[in-house]
Amino acid sequence: NNLEDFVQETDICITHGHVDHLFFIPEILEQADATVFATRAVMNTLEGWVEDTGCLVEVEPGYSWRQGNMRITVLKGKHTSFCAKTVFRKLLNPRLLRYFRNALFLAWAHPRFPEKGETAAYQIEAEGKRILLLGSMELDPDTVYPENADLLILPYQGKENMAEAAMEIVERLKPARILLDHFDDAFPPVSEEVDTRPFKKAMDERHPEIKVVKPKAGKPVTL
């Protein structure tokens, strides 16, 4: 996507404060008349980067607002953590040398763009339909999430056994459809292009009634 794809938006919902979610927000706000909704950790980061902080709205779980015919409600989320095996695999991967400059940038950015345990999920309701957007492939164990959402937007990155982790979320939430995101290699060498086929195969075998959609960059998805 290009920045031009976002300048017409009026509301921007941030799930958490990592650099891959925030880095272009100041530039978008320079071109767009938009309001950013996010938790206190994100506000703390953006207030040091954004000139006009009047467009920033702090939210917390339970906060709800209307945007046109949509109602958006904030839920508590949880960010996935790399296990030791994943950390060692990435450190020993030749990609670390190939993307060494990226690695230096990410090492610089990580402490400046903290998540601080404040990952949010968003429930979006419109026209009798309900969408649940997760910020990471993890659920807060103490939060009651809406089951049977018409669409679950599921970040597919950050676990050693992605298909198994995703299936656990599906079993808990029981969505009607799933739209995968975050499976691309956006910030190498920390990220990687994730093979979504094992999850699709598992879903076809165990939940053939639930359609799984893997979007392509630049192509709209009709829901």
Spans of model-derived segments:
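Active-site environment of divalent metal-dependent phosphoester hydrolases
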Residues: 18-23, 43-46, 63-65, 81-82, ...
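Binuclear metal-ion centers of metallo-dependent hydrolases, dominated by the metallo-beta-lactamase
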Residues: 35, 49-64, 146, 167, ...
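Pre-active-site segment of Zn-dependent metallo-hydrolases
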Residues: 1-18, 23-30, 48, 81-108, ...
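Beta-strand-turn-beta hairpins that frame and shape the catalytic cleft
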Residues: 64-73, 125-131, 222-223
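Conserved catalytic scaffold of divalent metal-dependent phosphoesterases
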Residues: 60-63, 69-82, 137-139, 149-155
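Active-site-proximal loop/helix segments of hydrolase catalytic cores
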Residues: 107-171
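Active-site neighborhood of phospho(di)ester-bond hydrolases with catalytic His/Asp-centered motifs
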Residues: 9-18, 37-40, 132-136, 152-157, ...
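Structured loop/turn residues at beta-strand edges in well-structured enzyme cores
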Residues: 7-8, 30, 51, 68-70, ...
